[in-house]
Amino acid sequence: MITEYKINWAVPGNIGYFISTSETGNSKGKYKHANFSNQVGEDSKNVESNINELKTLHGLNDITFMNQTHSNTVLEASREYAHLDCDAMFTEDKTISCAVLTADCIPILVTESSGRMIGCIHAGWRGLQLSLIHI
């Protein structure tokens, strides 16, 4: 079973979110926990098993993951792509979930007040230096 946490985030009722850890999961060997990345050399079947467990646990259809590029690239998530090369993504499609993977960078989850749009950001120093986030 994948370990996950809820944070105290005041979001509209139609927004679901969670934070998982690598503490448990279906991965093997040096990736023996809940690895969701095909970028590190793990058997893709184990990664797929971890992703499918998340989908089942939360009743999700499509999850779009970021292949973090340490850039200021922002893309719209869609069903056509399971992985996008970017450091921020968003969607207005209620059937798509956005996922950000981090190690030593900061994951940021965003929505607007009505919950019409969701997004996530991989906030590393390179992306921040390139003005990935504008406030």
Regions found by a protein language model. Give the residues of each.
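Conserved nucleotide-ligand handling architecture
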Residues: 1-19, 23-24
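A residue-level signal for beta-strand positions that form part of recognition/binding surfaces
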Residues: 14-17, 33, 63, 97
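Intrinsically disordered, low-complexity, positively charged segments
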Residues: 17-53
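Short, glycine/acidic-enriched capping/hinge loops at junctions between secondary-structure elements
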Residues: 29-34, 76-78, 131
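Phosphate-centric recognition/catalysis
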Residues: 44-123
